[in-house]
């Protein structure tokens, strides 16, 4: 482990935030929104020099688009996309979002009802009224429909998939290229890659990987390769775990509870976010008492107190807001630490999460995970 990398991981949020404020440049001359880590520093004449010039931009689906770059007005679907855009210093360029983003008024105070264009179905009239140059959607979003509805108005549809952890650096660099934030994007790629490389290096010492049962917000729903929860399966693999439901031939996301008891996993992780839209969670985590109540409910499941992970204290609840951060790298760091604490001595997931929040212009206001106490024989 390089000392320089260790310093990066241990670096305080305040120092990182100060550096980001120097590097970042917003899209408006007004100085930026609350929660944006990067205020406006780009001179207006630099933007004017590029007006009318188009560049071929290749999006996440490999589509070649002729765009005027950098983009200065965008509507963006998917909270993970919005986080990447804000992290590279282009948060002020976003003029409209979906409800998965705007529901979190603490984390995204600049987006209210007027700036929200829908949930899984988009309000195209509102998007047109917001006057963006582009609509950014993930590849599992309303891509074809959006193209059909918006291109007659001169609004291009760009595919960036911020939730996809198969190639996070690619998604970051797409954001950097689109908004003219290439330098900031490369810094973010480095922040992502260093802990990933460290985890990979340390896992070379593991002869037999430990098993994991990961549960989503709905009871007995999990991540199976090839489903829309595939990214969470990849997170388990990145952390050095073996998904007990990692068989791609399994259909859907719901599983037979009996299979959990038969597998007797080494680690159990449950996504819990409280009362929010979807399972992605929000900046303000549920209180520890609420996490504990959900854990107690799960412990009442038949046979659960006899599970190895439960008896040995390897049972955690956490939010997808935290574990899904930066292409689920944050979640992989926590899981790797929980699985192999003796190997991951240089890994500090709390520090990584704090630094990721600094990229967003925030400091964590609550703990986003809960460690369920070991349920020994006395329990």
Q: Language-model segments: which ranges?
A:
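A short, structured surface patch at a secondary-structure boundary
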Residues: 76-129, 134-140
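N-terminal low-complexity, Pro/Thr/Ser-rich intrinsically disordered segments
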Residues: 38-68
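Extracytoplasmic substrate-binding proteins
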Residues: 53-54, 64-66, 145-224, 242-245, ...
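Structural recognition of the beta-strand scaffold that forms the well-ordered cores
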Residues: 73-77, 95-98, 118, 134-138, ...
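Sec-dependent N-terminal signal peptides of Gram-positive bacterial secreted proteins and lipoproteins
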Residues: 7-31
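Bacterial lipoprotein signal-peptidase II cleavage site
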Residues: 26-42
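Short helix-initiation/N-cap motifs at beta->coil->alpha
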Residues: 60-62, 114-125, 248-257
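Flexible, glycine-rich surface segments
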Residues: 226-296, 300-302
